Amino acid sequence: MASRFNDYFGKRGMRYNQPTAPDTLERVCAFLAVGLLIVATIAVIKGRPQWGFISWQVWLHLATLAVVLAITPVMLLRKRGDSRHQLLGWIWSVCLFTTALVSLDMRTINNGGFSFIHILSVVTLIGVPVLIISARRRDLKRHRGQARAFVIGALLIAGFFSFPFNRMLGSWLFS
């Protein structure tokens, strides 16, 4: 009896087939992720004359973020829990983890030391495995909450702050 219960409800008592349709917050986040990807792409294109001066760490950081930003709307707006969602989730998680890991080696401000933004990198390095574990355990409430937190904090807010204050993307975009 217990195994049939766990097969249907999972270890945490949440139904696998519970509604996971996107809500308003997720639609807005998907829209903003697309917008941020477009603006970042425009900035990178406008910065072409300076491409030769950019380190491989920055390029890897930008590439993995572009993948995450491109996948985010798909993950937020389509059906969840199927094999495609899981595959895209793994790609999204690996790219976000790589982005955070590489950012620890990017210390061009603050006299080569760590800055406030590096706290977000450490939180991401800890949080991505927790996000994966919550999905594997079918703790869908925690998984969805953490995914939203990453989209809002690690992508949208951090992405917004990559443009002002004489940051590279901002200087390219507004040049």
Annotate each predicted stretch with a short phrase.
Residues A2-S175:
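Alpha-helical membrane insertion/targeting regions
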